[in-house]
Design a protein with these regions (language model features):
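Sec-dependent signal peptide recognition
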Residues: 1-8
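Beta-propeller domains with acidic blade repeats across secreted/periplasmic ectodomains
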Residues: 2, 13-205
Length: 205
């Protein structure tokens, strides 16, 4: 048990946190001013860095809270045969997720830190809340993270329905729930596993 605890601690220490991003509100406001839109529409800034980063997909719940899939693993732990051509022949033979993991192990010495490269960064789900009704998110928190196993791809899709948050991050379709209402997912279940068998997948998951 002691050695297992030490292994977990070592694994956690190797995980790099998402970068701290500079305030992006001013830049976003300037960008909004250049939008071409129907004059009947209004575009206003709801959230910008550092309250969120690298947003890929969003979903709203019944309380108008915004859940954001944030992507930090692009080309950092998620590999493909277009940028890693030495994968190509092995990748064409892959039939299972276990085959892809074996391929990563075979070529691990080509990556900084070996197999640690594939689990050093994590994608996450951010929760944005406008609690005062002012039209901007003044509260931001991490709803769920830990999507950084070697086979994990990118947190690329999110759907929120009746308190359930569905997240696509290959090889899994995840169900996330906040059962105690503290704004963090305390329940996580893989509803289906098996997506993204091959490495040539970036941009298609």
């Amino acid at each position: 048990m002691r050695s297992l605890a030490a292994l977990v601690l070592l694994f956690c220490d190797a995980l790099e946190p998402p970068p701290t991003l500079p305030d992006g509100a001013e830049e976003a406001t300037r960008a909004i001013a250049t939008f071409r839109k129907d004059p009947r529409l209004t575009v206003e800034l709801f959230a910008a860095e550092p309250r969120l980063g690298n947003p890929v997909a969003i979903g709203l719940d019944e309380r108008n809270r915004v859940f954001v899939a944030e992507e930090y693993r692009f080309n950092r732990g998620t590999e493909e045969n277009r940028t890693r051509p030495f994968f190509l022949e092995d990748d064409l033979r892959i039939r299972t997720l276990e085959d892809r993991l074996a391929m990563y192990r075979k070529f691990a010495d080509r990556f900084e830190g070996g197999m640690d490269w594939f689990s050093r960064w994590t994608d996450q789900v951010r929760l944005l809340e406008d609690r005062d009704g002012g039209g901007r998110a003044e509260v931001a928190s991490v709803f769920a993270d830990g999507f950084h196993q070697p086979l994990d791809g990118l947190a690329a899709g999110i759907l929120v329905r009746e308190g359930d948050v569905y997240l696509t991050c290959i090889p899994n379709l995840w169900l996330l729930r906040d059962r105690d209402g503290d704004g963090k997912a305390d329940f996580r279940e893989s509803l289906h596993r098996g997506f993204g068998v091959n490495a040539g997948f970036l941009g298609h998951d």
